[in-house]
Structures are given as C-alpha cells and as structure tokens.
A protein has these predicted regions:
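Alpha-helical transmembrane segments and their helix-helix packing motifs
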Residues: 2-10, 19-340
Length: 340
C-alpha cells in the first residue's frame, strides 16, 4: 500500500509567491495557503491514527471463544502506511511497539504526537490567518498532549487518550467551520481535510483486507461479522449503515457506504464531491482551471459512474490501492498548482 506523503513544516523559503487572483479581496501568499492546507491534513491524520489504534484494540480484545487472527497489530502498521519505517525501528509488530510508534514516537514523522506538533507549528507560522478559536484548539491540544505523554497509561487510560485525539479533531474542525471567512483560506483548509480524509477512509476500509481470518473461521462467520462491524464503528458509520440499508452487516454494503454513498460524510465520493467544489471555487477566484480541477473531476466521475459490484469483481483491495495512489497524485498536483 502506498506510504503517506508527508507535508510541509514551517521552514519554507521566505520568498513565497503571491497567488494571482482576479478578485482583489483574495491576496493570499502561497506559503500561507500551504500552511493552512497542512494544518488541516495533520489534524485529520492524527484523528485517523487514533481510529486505527482504536479499531485494532477492539479486534485484539475479541472473546477467547472467537479466536484471534493474530495479524491485527501488523495490519495497523500496514494500514497506517509506515511498514518500512516501523520495521527499522522495532521489528516485531506487537501491541506495545505499534502503540508507541503510532502515538508518541518522535522519530516517526506521522505519529500522533508529530502530527499535532506539525499542525501547531504550521498554525503558529500563519497565526493571523486563523481564528482565535482554531488557534486555541491546537494550542490547548498541544499542552494536553504533553501531559498525556508523561503518564504511564494502562489500556483504559489509552482508550481515553484515543478518544481525546478524536475530540481534538472534532473541535478544530468545528471551529474552522463555524468561524472562518468563506474565502481562499477556508477553501485551502477544507481541501486539506478532504484529501486526507479520502486517504484515511480508504485505508481504514482496507484494514479488513490485512486482518486475515483464522483457517477455522469462515467468511460470513461471527469473527468476520465482528471485524466488519469494527470497521463501521471506527468511521462513525454503524448507525448510518443500519439507517441506509436496514439489514445485517454485509461487506458489499459497507464498501458501498464508504466508497460510493455521498450521504456518508467520510465516503470517498463525498470527499471528492467536496474536493471538486473547493477546487472549482479556487479556479473561479484565480481565473483559471488547471490539472488539479481536471484530476478531481475525473476521480469524482469515476466514483459516480461505477457500481459496487464492479469494484468487488476487480478486487476491493486493488481498487483501494489504486485510489490511494490517485489521491496522493492529486495532493501533489494541488501543491504544484497552488502551494509552491
């Protein structure tokens, strides 16, 4: 599976270009736009890592009668997109090593600690472009994170920590939605959210592929059901699933909800609907459409014109891997087009 593409920090060259716009009220520096984009991506990524660890913990806490797959912690590393870095640092993928690597390890660029640190660093560099509520959410989170880091956490405290990380993202996202002016700063911030969220939804859906069923367990059995239910729970979609489909948990319907259903906020289709909208707003404001707009429309069109049965026929894992590659490519195109 493709690795995470790491973002900018605050040490960009001082000679940032001013974005050319046909609207006099939009005069943002590319450096400012870049930082706003990456603040949102890093906060969203921290939440995703918390969801991955929460899901993995649930899978490993199955009653003994179910048996375990024994691959859950390795799957967490694979799904986080950092298998090679983890192997160099730890080797064995057990609970202690994976939790340490994905939460507080300062040498992992995409640990929760470093995601929140980089989000705060980028936010501080463009402090005047943020509302006070957004800055307070990040600054308070950073101070609280240091208190968590000093604690000796048992499983109960670790679960509280993961819930706290998810809440940090909700507070920051809500602050941005409620307080930012609807201009190019907001549009770049939302692009960061949805590019990252699309990547994360694809990866957390793929976690089921990497958690293998034991030889004694059948597809459609109790363990398989529990694993798929965990996937739904970790994208806050269990209630939505039953509301939309009104039947027992089925893999094909879960994939339909998380890939193609635009009513589901974390679905790939919903993410790309928003990505296309915000890119079009930027294109209109800056007076030209470019490769980013074309790539986003192509992906949205593909998602709109496919059926979930077609995806399963070609292989769900293969579809997700291709999607992650294309999503990373769009992220790079946005940077080239607007943020360099």
């Amino acid at each position: 599976m493709p690795d995470f593409s790491y973002g900018a920090t605050t040490d960009r060259a001082a000679g940032a270009q001013r974005l050319v716009t046909k609207r006099p009220d939009l005069t943002m520096l590319s450096r400012t736009a870049d930082s706003l984009y990456w603040v949102s991506r890093y906060v969203e990524r921290a939440e995703y890592l918390a969801r991955i660890l929460d899901a993995t913990t649930r899978l490993t806490n199955l009653p003994h009668a179910y048996g375990g797959a024994g691959t859950e912690w390795h799957s967490a590393v694979l799904t986080a997109g950092c298998e090679e870095a983890f192997a160099k640092a730890y080797g064995e993928a057990n609970e202690r090593n994976v939790c340490d690597f994905l939460t507080f390890n300062p040498d992992n660029p995409s640990s929760i600690r470093n995601c929140l640190a980089l989000a705060r660093a980028n936010a501080r560099a463009v402090r005047t472009a943020l509302t006070s509520e957004m800055w307070d959410a990040l600054n308070s989170a950073w101070l609280e994170l240091q208190r968590f880091e000093k604690k000796r956490m048992d499983r109960e405290e670790f679960a509280r920590f993961l819930d706290w990380v998810k809440n940090v993202s909700l507070v920051f996202d809500g602050s941005a939605y409620r307080t930012m002016l609807r201009d190019d700063g907001y549009w770049f911030s939302r692009l960061g959210v949805y590019i990252e969220r699309a990547d994360n939804t694809a990866r957390i859906l793929d976690v089921k592929y990497h958690v293998l069923l034991p030889d004694t367990e059948q597809v459609g059995g109790s363990l398989d059901y529990f694993q798929w239910t965990t996937v739904l729970r970790e994208v806050s979609a269990l209630t939505a699933y039953h509301w939309v489909y009104r039947e027992a948990v089925k893999p094909v319907l879960i994939a339909d909800l998380l890939i193609l259903n635009r009513r589901m906020p974390r679905s790939l289709a919903a993410c790309y609907e928003n990505i296309s909208r915000f890119l079009d707003l930027l294109g209109d404001a800056y007076g030209r459409q470019g490769p980013a707009q074309r790539q986003a429309r192509k992906t949205l069109s593909s998602l709109s014109n496919t059926q979930i049965e077609t995806i399963f026929e070609g292989g769900l894992h293969e579809f997700i891997s291709d999607f992650i590659t294309e999503n990373n490519r769009l992220g790079a195109t946005i940077i080239d087009q607007y943020l360099q």
